[in-house]
From Swiss-Prot:
Protein name: UDP-2,3-diacylglucosamine hydrolase
Claim: Protein transport is one of the keywords in the record: no
Function: Hydrolyzes the pyrophosphate bond of UDP-2,3-diacylglucosamine to yield 2,3-diacylglucosamine 1-phosphate (lipid X) and UMP by catalyzing the attack of water at the alpha-P atom. Involved in the biosynthesis of lipid A, a phosphorylated glycolipid that anchors the lipopolysaccharide to the outer membrane of the cell.
Name of encoding gene: lpxH
Keyword Repeat: no
Assigned EC number: 3.6.1.54
Listed transmembrane segments: none
Length: 245
């Protein structure tokens, strides 16, 4: 009995090393598990479900093969792929979950999320997030031709990279009080999220109880997987060279 969690792969046609490692993971490791959870930023950028490039087709095919084999796959959007919609889910067999979801992880209620909503000190990002999650603005964006949306997406991506370099480390990390507040609100003592690219297991206290916050790693330099069984969870890495083994 195994459940796997991944996040922050930032898949793109340019990073074939990440894509190859991911496809190997899907074809080998994810085949005989209870469930796969993808906690956001699966893609470097998502400009609409109508983008059907050869690169995206192979990613969707990998998920479809897995779900057709009987492995349920769940997705929570991140700050790079929040425009993923129903068409993508239909084509892959994945289930789109609310941005804050409590699951039963082998008897333990566990809050899963991407993690960007925990960074409440990053006021510039929160203002940006509020704008791009506006349904009317999203409708206007989808009215644009796909090629123009690609240009807009590239501009947003380059601007985001520049802004992040100018921000302090503390602003870009989660706000501890917000973590405790949300866990107390959801009545859980276990949380799993990504977004910060700082894999670790944090032992904290929520309402006088010992609690655990597990942070998933990104896939920039190697694969990062949280492997959970009824006996517990462990953060593991997957070397890009494993695809050749």
């Amino acid at each position: 009995m195994t459940t796997l969690f991944i996040a922050d792969l930032h898949l793109s046609a340019e990073r074939t090393d990440i894509t190859d490692c991911f496809l190997h993971f899907m074809q080998q490791e994810a085949r005989n598990i209870d469930a796969l959870y993808v906690l956001g930023d699966l893609f470097e950028m998502w400009i609409g479900d109508d983008d059907d490039s050869p690169f995206l087709q192979q990613i969707k095919h990998a998920f479809k093969q897995l779900t057709d084999s009987g492995v349920p796959c769940y997705f929570i959007y991140g700050n790079r792929d929040f425009l993923i919609g129903s068409r993508f889910c239909q084509e892959t067999g994945m289930t789109l979950l609310p941005e804050h979801t409590v699951i039963d992880l082998y008897g333990t209620p566990t809050l899963i999320l991407h993690g960007d909503t925990l960074c409440i000190e990053d006021e510039d990002y929160l203002r940006y997030r509020k704008r791009v999650h506006n349904r009317f603005i999203q409708w206007l964006f989808f009215c644009l031709p796909l090629t123009y949306r690609q240009k807009v997406g590239d501009k947003i991506r380059s601007g985001s990279s520049k802004n992040n370099k100018e921000k302090t480390t503390s602003i870009m990390d989660v706000t501890p009080n917000e973590v405790v507040r949300l866990m107390a609100e959801q009545n859980v003592i276990d949380m799993i999220h990504g977004h910060t690219h700082r894999p670790d297991v944090h032992h904290i206290e929520v309402n006088g109880k010992a609690a655990i916050r597990t942070v998933l790693g990104d896939w920039y330099h190697h694969g990062s997987v949280l492997v959970c069984t009824p006996d517990g969870c462990k953060l593991e890495t997957r070397d890009f060279s494993e695809k050749n083994q």
